């Protein structure tokens, strides 16, 4: 029988065509198996959250503890408010219980006994406000205390009096421009490299140090010491001569504070997150100009054959797990009831690829309209629409959550990224009250000129939602991005980055949707 079948096969005139057909069928079966595997793939890790009523905000965690640090400020001096606000947040995140005395409202003679504290933080440029109390502080340091000057000091008689003790050989009345900072290699993570400032100005006092000083950071040109320590008998002083204050440099001041005493330990987050905004989402149709020119393929093919394989290689090389935040459609309808997306193929395919890569799915929006009510005025900044009421906001999120479960049933999402980083007070309250599936909000960490973005601090909010802002973005590493990344790596031991899949379709980045 077998021989008979073989003779018939040999005489069959279309056998070559059958072979080709068999090859195509084999390829189809492989692709089908791969697609099914992608669709039902799930992450190999699970996220475990504390119950919302068990999560404790940082302020509550140190409330009632005895203050170990005394912060002396003089709010009547220029720039003190900004520096004080920065240091308060730094100390809160480092979990350092702090008592604050404002010399604009309190006589120096009424400063509490320094023996109650381990450290004294002086946040004022002109030390004259301390009067004779400055002498008492230096005696306390000699006996084993630790003092830090957080602001660039002004040259006065009081600075000249303590200068030799805190490592200053000589100083001038002039200030020099500090274009960047170079930490010592063993002082900070990322030390040994230079990080440039945006909008530098003459912020650092021109001075020379003596042999007591141990320099921890210098200016970009290496000429000006910016952070140094000096041992004073049994105690230690640290001086900051940066003169720039704000979120983007907190890590440098936290590192400076950690120099006080023989050792400093403080809690950090120790995590990294890499977000793919608008992913998965409806894939744009057509041919982007540069994709068509350089690759000769459609956007959909470019995503699957070039862009995603490249990201997978990066992920494998550096151990990255991407978090893709899903958007169901790019419509602008905020008034009608949500309508289910009909084309689910892109979502299940690219979402499955993400899960297969051991990534995570998050939420971005039913559409790309931020969660704001009619009382939010976009002005000339955006052409977005407002949602008519809280009920509509909840309905949009409910549809997104249901859609995610429909196309990626194996995934469990918990993080929400606001479109364009915009989230109103009412929208934020609605999430905490009515959408228990959202446990984390990842908006923006660094402030901008606009009042619309939802700017966050790392921590747990009163309603138990984790505030986990994103820090840097895009594919082009600029000076500001490097500075922010370095600072936060040393402040919270955190690295967060986000990018848009369609950034590569544009001549310039970032995307107009900007989140």
Protein language model features and the residues they cover:
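N-terminal Sec-pathway targeting helices
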Residues: 7-26
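Helical hinge/lid and interdomain linker segments adjacent to catalytic or ligand-binding clefts
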Residues: 79-156, 305
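A glycine-centered loop/beta-turn motif at secondary-structure junctions
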Residues: 64-69, 117, 146, 204-271
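A glycine-rich, often tryptophan-bearing local segment used as a flexible ligand/cofactor-contacting loop or short
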Residues: 127-194
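Metal-dependent polysaccharide deacetylase catalytic core of the NodB/CE4 family, i.e.
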Residues: 68-75, 141-143, 149-161, 316-426, ...
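Catalytic domains of cell-wall/extracellular-matrix polysaccharide-remodeling enzymes
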Residues: 23, 28, 389-462
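Conserved small/polar residues in nucleotide/adenosyl-binding loops
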Residues: 507-514
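Active-site beta->alpha N-cap acidic-glycine motif
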Residues: 245-255, 259-353, 357
């Amino acid at each position: 029988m077998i021989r008979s079948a073989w003779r018939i096969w040999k005489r069959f005139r279309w056998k070559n065509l059958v072979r080709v057909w068999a090859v195509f069928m084999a390829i189809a079966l492989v692709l089908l198996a791969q697609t099914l595997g992608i669709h039902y793939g799930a992450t190999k890790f699970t996220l475990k959250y504390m119950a919302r009523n068990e999560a404790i905000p940082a302020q509550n965690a140190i409330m009632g503890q005895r203050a170990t640090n005394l912060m002396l400020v003089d709010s009547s001096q220029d720039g003190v408010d900004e520096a004080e606000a920065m240091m308060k947040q730094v100390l809160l995140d480092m979990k350092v219980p702090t008592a604050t005395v404002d010399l604009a409202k309190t006589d120096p003679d009424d400063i509490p006994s320094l023996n109650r504290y381990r450290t004294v933080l002086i946040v004022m440029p002109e030390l004259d406000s301390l009067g004779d109390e400055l002498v008492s502080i230096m005696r306390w340091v000699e006996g084993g205390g630790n003092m830090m000057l957080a602001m660039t000091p002004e040259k006065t008689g009081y600075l000249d009096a303590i200068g030799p003790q805190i490592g200053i050989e000589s100083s001038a009345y002039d200030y020099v421009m500090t274009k960047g900072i170079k930490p010592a290699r063993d002082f900070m993570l990322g030390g040994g490299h230079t990080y440039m400032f945006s909008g530098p100005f003459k912020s650092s006092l021109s001075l020379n140090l003596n042999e007591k000083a141990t320099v921890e950071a210098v200016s970009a040109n290496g000429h000006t010491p910016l952070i140094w320590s000096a041992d004073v008998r049994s105690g230690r002083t640290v001086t900051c001569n940066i003169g720039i204050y704000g979120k983007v440099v907190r890590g440098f001041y936290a590192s400076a504070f950690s120099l006080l005493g023989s050792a400093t330990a403080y809690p950090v987050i120790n995590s990294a997150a890499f977000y793919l905004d608008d992913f998965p989402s409806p894939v744009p149709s057509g041919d982007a100009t540069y994709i068509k020119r350089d690759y000769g393929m459609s956007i959909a093919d470019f995503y699957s054959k070039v862009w995603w394989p490249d990201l997978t290689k990066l992920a494998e090389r550096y151990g990255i797990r991407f978090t893709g935040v899903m958007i169901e459609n790019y419509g602008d309808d905020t008034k009608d009831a949500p309508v289910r997306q009909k084309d689910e193929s892109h979502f299940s395919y690219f979402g499955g690829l993400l899960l297969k890569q051991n990534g995570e799915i998050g939420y971005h929006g039913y559409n790309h309209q931020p969660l704001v009510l009619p009382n939010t005025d976009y002005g000339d900044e955006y052409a977005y629409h407002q949602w008519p009421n809280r009920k509509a906001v909840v309905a949009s999120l409910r549809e997104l959550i249901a859609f995610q479960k429909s196309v990626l049933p194996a995934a469990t999402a918990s993080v929400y990224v606001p479109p364009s980083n915009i989230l109103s007070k009412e929208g934020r309250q609605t999430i905490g009250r009515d959408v228990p599936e959202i446990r984390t909000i990842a908006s923006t960490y660094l402030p901008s000129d606009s009042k619309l973005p939802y700017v966050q601090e790392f921590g747990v909010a009163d309603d138990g939602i984790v505030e986990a802002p994103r820090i840097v973005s895009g594919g082009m590493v600029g000076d500001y991005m490097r500075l922010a990344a370095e600072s936060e790596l040393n402040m919270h031991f955190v690295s967060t980055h986000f990018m848009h899949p369609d950034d590569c379709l544009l001549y310039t980045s970032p995307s107009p949707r900007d989140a």
